[in-house]
Amino acid sequence: MPFSLGQRWISDTESELGLGTVVGVEGRMVTVLFPATGENRLFSRTEAPLTRVIYNPGDTVESHEEWKLTVTEVEEKDSLIIYHGTHSETGEQVSLRETLLNHNIRFNKPQDRLFAGQIDRLDRFNVRYQCQLLRNKLATSDLLGLQGPRVGLIPHQQWIAHEVGQRFAPRVLLADEVGLGKTIEAGLIIHQQLLTGRAERILVIVPDTLRHQWLVEMLRRFNLRFSVFDEDRCVEAYADHDNPFYTEQLVICSLDLLRKKRRLDQALDADWDLMVVDEAHHLEWSEEAPSRAYQIVEALSEEIPGVLLLTATPDQLGHQSHFARLRLLDPDRFYDYEAFLKEEDSYKDVATAADALASGEILSDESIAGLTQLLAEKDISASITLIQDDAADADSRFQARDELLQDLLDRHGTGRVLYRNSRASVKGFPVRNLHVHPQKMPEQYVTAYRVSSMMNKHLDTNAKVRQVLSPEKIYQDFDSGSAAWWKFDPRVDWLIDFLKNNRSKKVLIIASQAETALSLEEALRTREGIQATVFHEGMSIIERDKAGAYFAQESGGAQALICSEIGSEGRNFQFASNLVLFDLPLNPDLLEQRIGRLDRIGQKNDVEIHLPFLANTAQERLMQWYHQGLNAFECTCPSGHILFNEFSGELLESLLNNDEAVLESLLDGTKARYQELKVAMEQGRDKLLEINSHGGERANQLVKTLADKDEDTQLIGSVIRLWDIIGVEQEDSGENAIVLHPSEHMMFPTYPGLPEDGITVTFDREMALSRDDIALITQEHPLVQTGLDLITSSETGTTSVAVLKNKALPAGTIFLELIYLADASAPKSSQLYRYLPPTPIRVLLDKNGNNLSDNVTYESFNKQLSAVNRHIASKLVNASQAILHPLFAKAESFATTQLETLTECAREKMTSQLSGELERLKALKAVNPNIRDEELSHLSEQMAELNRYLDSSQLQLDAIRLVLVSHA
């Protein structure tokens, strides 16, 4: 290369150094100073990775004094370039020597990089284009946020997430029965809200015992990095901000932290977009005295636009508290408890009509009359005629039924606020089998009972019942807490024998008290050396997690996990199928929560429930009431709380007094009332709610679409090529898994999300679900998203030169391929990307400026191209400059026409979708008060805002490829 002092060159490998100046030429070496950074580089004269910077007429250049010149003539004198042209501010004719060019010049624009000789490899151009297409495809997907999480494709979960996650500031109560996956539903909604930009700051409030579990679940299943906040974390955060909650976007904390006024005030001031409250059945409310927990959540719900409340047992604290939770979501709608009860009574007619439609049978005259009355504001005669016509197309009849069903659900009930799936409507649950193991009452307990009944006559009935249900507690209190009751309790003997006979099986043991759980662990360890671990409220979160992990460990792990009552809230152990209830809780909902730790979707075996109890005691009578009265062991009992409230007086009396006649009367009365409630619930509001909550055929179709996306082999190829280009080491580990490692030769110094010690990934959902240590890769995974961002936000692949070997074309024929992006800058929260995301526009010109892109596809053209080395590529560009400059203007004209078309299509799509939804909601609001005013005003504002953004849409040249025909 001919070098002379003062010439300007740019580094091909370190373009961030800016414009360099030759300051030394000695022998075989050349020294270049890069004034922008103050660094010198020494290069070999024959192999220097440098490109000479020479501008052309029409270009604008900047002097070191920051004035600009539009070049009209380029003169070379003594191996240096002098630019002649027009001063941009004064209009005068001026000259500028290349030594006086601005040092900070960056060749960021594709055309600048092309003419400066900064030409990328052919495969990088291709990967960049594929990345832009992939980003566009992801942004326009109606299922954005649903595919990425590592969860099973379960219809009702995906349906609820799809329905709720697309709303602006959703405010809903997720109340699926135990085991149906409320946490997953909430995670899917959170994931959607974040990916779509509808939410950025999220506060999750959970019981103290579940903080770490939520942290792990959000990361492992949803790739969301939450931070757990406690008092210590808040104190540490003061170093960064006066309000600790502003130091993180995604926060998990407990209600206990927010009981402190200072922390609550800070949380209220933290500008959250979405609040999630788990175990919301603990929020007790009465009109006269709402609980402190309720008041905290109420204050936050008044400040935070989006609210998700999670509970498996809506009525655990009574129907009033259930109403109060709905009141948190929409106080204007749920303003009066008595009015709410009257409205619930009216749901029966709606459910009857919905049943008639859902059955698929010919509608009776009574059903038609009911539907006509319920949908009086709409003419449904054509739909009814179609449904009743046996000769009509089956799909058309189904669609007519479905539309009327949706009209019913839209106009009546709490369908937009409350989602509750029952096991009756969801498939995939195991059989539950009860095994009772009566044991003889030991004399030690008989004595302790006798003494306790004499000494504790002052106790109220509830306290007395709790005592007789836990004889070991009475005995310990009786003997000053030092006695080892487990040495003589026959239930412990049975438990040891059971574990010894089932050594290969994992067993979950639940007892009411932490002291009981600890004593059982001691008994198993000291008497038989059985490996067991304990889980109780006195342990730290990390200790509980370790206990859970030790139990889950297949090889060398604990055979048994012994939980106190907290073990039946929030923790799931469906890898085990044997449950031992060492005692029974005095609450049907708590019993269901215990069983629900194993009886969940994903449980592959029947759940075996073992109940050792002391015969002829309160334990046996409570077992009989649960089993014979409620059938609560082998089936879920949605009416359990109602029955407990109605029969609690008789039940408590029966537990305290061993009277067979009282027990028989109690069991008969409970069974009869249970059947009544079962029939009433079938006929009433719950059935309507189920139809809306599980999604029916629509949910099945949604899951099928997601499953089809999982099989997209094109995505797999694109992602593998992306990692190849970046320089990620990929090692096949068999079983559809790949181990990724950062390499020393990666294109970028860091790859966020790729650990130093590597990560194992798979594109197979089933494998990812079966292996916690393997990440599921979809187009939504952070490793893919980050990889796309690394490529598209850098200069990688913005220029390329290739050769087309085709003897049917004259040698030397030129083609210019340009990739533009149609873009309208807008905040993510505006949802503009749904209508006009950055969209690649391809223009392929011949030397005469004809656009061939409609006739020559990218794929067919790309397959015929061959790479050329960089030195030859630079020469080809320089030789073609006179032809190329006019082509750029023509290409932009073609692209502008396409931009206008895209913008108008986006506007039509936006107007059609949003105005249609707005009109639908306005019509519904007249008959269903669950439609919030905020939703209507948000849609109107969003339409106006999107129109403004679309008006400012523009083109951006993203990449250029020069192609020359060769016969060589």
From Swiss-Prot:
GO biological process assignments: regulation of DNA-templated transcription
Enzyme Commission code(s) on record: 3.6.4.-
Every Helicase ATP-binding domain range: 163-332
SUPFAM superfamilies: P-loop containing nucleoside triphosphate hydrolases
Gene3D superfamilies per UniProt: 2.30.30.140, 2.30.30.930, 3.30.360.80, 6.10.140.1500, 6.10.140.2230, P-loop containing nucleotide triphosphate hydrolases, Tandem AAA-ATPase domain
Ranges spanned by the short sequence motif DEAH box, renumbered to the chain: 278-281
Xref: Pfam families: Helicase_C, RapA_C, SNF2-rel_dom, Tudor_1_RapA, Tudor_RapA
Family statement: Belongs to the SNF2/RAD54 helicase family. RapA subfamily.
UniProt function note: Transcription regulator that activates transcription by stimulating RNA polymerase (RNAP) recycling in case of stress conditions such as supercoiled DNA or high salt concentrations. Probably acts by releasing the RNAP, when it is trapped or immobilized on tightly supercoiled DNA. Does not activate transcription on linear DNA. Probably not involved in DNA repair.
Protein name: RNA polymerase-associated protein RapA
